[in-house]
Amino acid sequence: MATGRSTSTESSEKTCQQRDPLPEYRALCGTDGDAAEILTDVLTNTDSDGVVFCLAHNCYSYNIGGGEALLTLCLPAKRPWGAEKCLPVIQFRCDASRAQEFLFQGRPIPVRYIQTNLNHRAVKKFFKPILSVLTCSDKKGGGGEGAHADLKSTIFWFRAKFVAAVRKTFKITASPFWMISTFGCTEAQFVLVSSCYFFERHECTIDTLSHLSRLFDGSRGRQLTTVNTFSDLAGMFGTSAWLGRVPEFSAYVGKKLARDDLESAAVDEAVNAFRGQLMLSNADLIHYIYLSFFQCLNKEKFLEYSLRTNPHNIDGVPPEEPIITGFIDEGFKSKMATYYTKSSYLKNHVRVGSLYLDGVEGYSPEAIEAGPPAAAGGGGGADRYWAGQSRDVQGLLSDILADHPASRLSPDLHGLLDLAALGDSSGVAGGVKDSLFPEPLRCPVYRCQYLNKTFFAVVTRDNLARAWERAVQLPTQVTGWEGMEDARLTACVHYAELAFSLGHLREQLSVSRHEYFNPRLPVFNLVLDFDLPLKKPGLSLERVYSICRSVRSDVLSVLGVLGEVDEAAHPVYFFKSACPRPEWDEPYAGRPFCTCDAKLGLRIITPLPRGVAIVGGAPLVALAKILNRMIKMNREDLLEICPGLPDADGPLDTGIYHRGRCVRLPHTYKVNEACGLERLLRLFVCHPGSPDKAAYIRDAMTLRNLLHHSKSAYWEGNAREGVSEEAPQKTKVVYSVTDVSENFLVCQTQQQLPRSYERPDSRIETMTGRDLVTWVTEVAWPKVFHNIKAYIPDDKTTQFHFVKFIHTSHNIIQVKPQRGNNFVCISSNHRNKTQSVRIFIVLYTNKKDEVTITLMSQCFAHKCNSNKPRAHFSIPLQLRGRDF
């Protein structure tokens, strides 16, 4: 309707100018009565004593001249969207002197005068869209008095509907308060904003025009608090000194909006430069966008940009050179470019702490080597070992501790690991280990699942490699099999798989074995547990091989930070978890290589660079995190099969490098509850740099190459190159690996947040003169309890009637019931309604006299994110005044 009316208005004005080229001015009108009724009275020529005021107009020269003028009265459109902001409703001829008084002196024009000089043809075109809807007709009427009679009679018969339509189409008010509150309460802002908004071409909101008016002219003029009537508003507008500057302001608005569009496009381009190219998680992406826009548009930079684009300086700004993007810190851009790019990440953001030491030893070679075939009895598994359950471990270590109190071994798994790490016969180790083995060897500790029980085994002589040689069937009958391609060779390697547990613990150790990580011993082989969630099952052999090659490249790149790496010769062993066994009636033809439906599981093992060892679990955790970041950058390989990878921590498990954690050995099985064997870790050949794969496969079935704390043949061979017996080479011991820029987006985001006082408890006690628990009891808890009653179900509110408070840290107060330890979950209804939920209050202060208290809970249920803290509500409290 607005578009049709606007077109009619333009044609009407052209017709009037052809007939009588009078100067025409548009004015926003208002009446002290009901504008819709008065407008209807004008159109129906009904007697009325009403008058019309000019609230704003587009005559900026303060001079109309002699003769007559054509005045077009307008009303604000209720929903203009992108169309005209005010629409014409009346057009009439007016004496120049009366028009001068109407526009510039605030004198109203009587309705009778308007009726006498009304332009009937123009008015009919103004309201043709509304009348065609009311009469359900689109007939073209004639002009002149006949047309006016037709218009008059139509509106007369449909007066009620016409008045309602006018009220829906136009913003009609009976006082100037809407105008003042919308366009500004000072003279300068009101005149500039209202004139530009209603009568000039622009594409912006009133808020934008208000901001630009303050940039255009800092002086405000008089306050409009005394303007109470349309007469006052009309007088103020017509006599304002800023009316003549509206064209200048309109030109500035055009320049400023064009500059803002240029700057906005430049900022978006700068942000999207990294946004679309880097593998960012959703959290990192949010932080990155926040930081980018904050650097461009923070208060200080925005004020600087506003100063450089004010009316005095905007013409001097280079037209095609953005200003705001220059505010982005070059260091921030450089860090983004290098941190999320594989080629520069390791070089610029990873730091390694190391020193050179003599006598760095892991497992004793005798403990992981096979005994004589006769001693082994031709079988597999452990040849010399001690095994027992938890109670046996406790009894053994208790006896040793009674005989050797200086050993200070704890009677649990940790003590067993400490005992296994002892190997110096000249010290206390010999005497401590006498009850186990004749030689005090540094030996591994394994976990074995047997008869639905967990056994811990300390092994000092092992025949596991012989068992693997019998279980793994190589394509030796094929001539030249050593030179096959990796993928083809993988398909030709078969296993004599077992289905059930074996009859003796010694034999079971050959099919079910997990190595415990021992922080008392240095690490020589990097063992990685790789689990990649899959979008859907069905991976081809070539796809899995491509993933392995990509991961191999990342592993070798990370190892290159620790020492020299020959990428062609350095072995990286891959062992893929066997797919679920097919159903008996499932056809084999067309079956993909990998049918794993939940995840792709790999065990990845590689020796550290020559002469390098790692002590402690922290560097290994850091390496796994770094590798996770590297792997997540492989957009082309992994994103299609695992769309959620950017938001995950990564496919590598970082929790296997702590005391008491173990990882399953290659070529072994998982044992299910029915004592069945499943998920065999099968060899997956991936050694593209070598034409001879026989040595690679042989080493992949050698125990010393697959354990955390044993020196592999490759490591020892490289470490001894060029070293004389008189001057043995020292070992480079890595004690720390640090990603110096880890979480730098989060850290920089936190730096931009309001500063919090470091010790909320001290501030509260200092300002209130009470200890923290007393203040919480008397001041904070009543308000917290009020919110609990308001927002938490009644059946869970009663448990908070009698509580006590425990001061646990500088900003945490734990809430406990008077009876019992904890509460029932207040977030969800669990079937097991146990009182295991912790409730606590967190204190936060970033203002001198105010503290924010947040009620939080921790529920152990999986439905509540497994003990993840959850905030329920926050309340600000004044430390002085009524809250005190």
Swiss-Prot record:
Keyword Zinc-finger belongs to the record: yes
EC number, as in UniProt: 2.7.7.-
Family: Belongs to the herpesviridae DNA primase family.
A single GO molecular function term of this UniProt record: hydrolase activity
Gene Ontology CC annotations of this record: host cell nucleus
An individual GO BP term: DNA replication
Subunit description: Associates with the helicase and the primase-associated factor to form the helicase-primase factor.
InterPro entries membership: HSV_PRIM
The protein, known as: DNA primase
Keyword annotations of the record: ATP-binding, DNA replication, Helicase, Host nucleus, Hydrolase, Metal-binding, Nucleotide-binding, Transferase, Zinc, Zinc-finger
Annotated site residue numbers, Essential for primase activity: D529, D531
Span of zinc fingers (CHC2-type): 825-864
Biological role stated in the UniProt entry: Essential component of the helicase/primase complex. Unwinds the DNA at the replication forks and generates single-stranded DNA for both leading and lagging strand synthesis. The primase initiates primer synthesis and thereby produces large amount of short RNA primers on the lagging strand that the polymerase elongates using dNTPs.
Broad class of the protein's primary localization: host cell
Localization of this protein: Host nucleus
Domain of life: Viruses
Gene this protein is translated from: 56
Pfam families listed in its UniProt record: Herpes_UL52
Species assigned in the record: Equine herpesvirus 2 (strain 86/87) (EHV-2)
